[in-house]
Amino acid sequence: MKNIKEKATLWLSDTFDSETQNEIQQLITENSDDLTDRFYKDLEFGTGGMRGMMGAGTNRINKYTLGKATQGLCNYLKKTYTDQKLKVAIAYDCRHNSDTFSRLVAEVLSANDIHVVLFEDLRPTPELSFAVNELNCHAGIVLTASHNPPEYNGYKVYWTDGGQIVPPQDKSIIDEVNSLDFSDINFNAKPELITEIGAEVDEAFWKASIKNGTFDIEGREDLKIVFTSLHGTSIKLIPEVLKRAGYSQVHSIKEQEIPNGDFPTVKSPNPEEPEALEMAIALAEKIGADIVLGTDPDSDRIGIAVRDSEGKIKLLNGNQAMVVMTDFLMKQWQQQGKLNGKQFVGSTIVSTSMVNDIAASYGVETKIGLTGFKWIAKMIKDFPELDFIGGGEESFGYMVGDFVRDKDAVTSALLACEIAAAAKSNGSSFYETLLKLYTKHSFYKERLVSFTKKGMDGAAQIKKIMIDLRKNPLTHIDGSKVTFVNDYDASTEKNMITGEEKSIHLPKSNVLIYHTEDGTKVAARPSGTEPKIKFYFSVQSQLDTIENAKAKEQELDKKIDRIITEMAI
């Protein structure tokens, strides 16, 4: 506690403004437990940026932690581009203080003689990624904490290609940030270097989205859509892009249209959770809609709900949406005569392996990266000789084409409607399209189970779980022999039958994946953005007919239940 108080006392110096000093002094006087949480560590500027609770302290998002991160970025940009006029794009979401923080970040950049193009109002994250390329920027920054609780905010950094920072830039920027003291931040803004942007970038984005996300289909005017932005940024782009594409029956949830960092109508603004889409699904059932679209606050993730075999609106998981989208895109490329062996799709190590099966059936390669969309964006940069068709991950993110280099709920919403409209016009449905893929390839069933472990104790518990899984590896999972164990921290793939080890040629990451003889996959991974440890379960079995899909799903669900019980997690 003594070291924490000493650390906190430094925040009473003249480096910090009076508001910050008063906030810290009160915590010291009260000897508050909150003081410990605010100062027991520094909020890490990680490989994609920062995310944390707002407030004064080294373990919080505030003027000084954001200022230090930005100053480090400025220093790195100047060392990298010694003879260029630097330009950085900035966007922000609907969260509390996001607009203020974006202005602050712009001021630090301008103080360092860097030209800033700042969105005049909140905008989706994919539009920021697009703007970096469109406006020839050297970097981009978005102020967002995705779907975290209201007390959180965050800071993500993008590089010249519009993708989030990856090696070697990420470590070099982190080193620059860590070398600084708070007193090194230059807050002396140069307003003449800050330019506001908005409508002109929206227009360019809409055109690019329609170019990449629409195809030669029929039935757009007959598709009935319910859309919710969950109080976030997608309200700025999705209704308009659907209208321009020819979708006239779009019903928006009025109560959730207004951007609001408190997210007052939902427990969590996360479209991965069915509860977040309750209002939208209720309206869809009432009006007989075909599809429901819901996005998270910064509009990179999308939840898609469609009518199942019994006519009920059902939220698809990210893997299900991804396989249908991937198959549809490749079918379109095939019909246009564009598949020639020089294309690829992208996915991640914890996402469904069904994507690999589908791509292979079209003669298309699947490239697999670590968890996080930045690795899919990096593939585009690393393989310029190949055309990128699309890519996704299990956490409700998808990207269509390479005009954006991050998951893009806007164009994904458009693509989902194209799939649904085309299916409906042919007497089928989005859901039936999925079931047909299951009969063709195999019924893959996935489930994500997360455990929240907050604070210092929680971090220690998560560490212990991963150590135990490595020291005492599973030999069987639900009676099926473990054949391979992939340890991405050790960069090894071990054959559990022969004992042979191979190298994994991906950056190190604290992920462990078990593979069994019957095609089961179990992955364990601590979250990089939340105090959670995540377990990903994937099981599969052949499906003979669509009519047996419900029974097959129940069978596979029971298998996952058995595995969870067996692992005692």
Predicted regions and their residues:
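An N-terminal, well-structured beta->alpha segment
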Residues: 8-105, 195-222, 233
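Gly/Ser/Thr-enriched, mixed-charge loops and adjacent short helices
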Residues: 11, 15, 34-39, 43, ...
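Conserved phosphate/anionic-ligand binding catalytic regions in large, soluble enzymes, centered on
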Residues: 39-59, 145-146, 229-241, 297, ...
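N-terminal small/polar loop signature for handling phosphorylated ligands or for N-terminal nucleophile
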Residues: 89-152, 248-303
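Short Gly/Thr/Asp-enriched flexible loops that form oxyanion-binding sites at enzyme active sites
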Residues: 101-109, 152-159, 300-319, 355
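Glycine-rich phosphate-binding loop plus the immediately following alpha-helix
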Residues: 158-186, 319-342, 347-357
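Phosphate-binding and adjacent anionic-ligand microenvironments
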Residues: 285, 289-291, 312-314, 332-525, ...
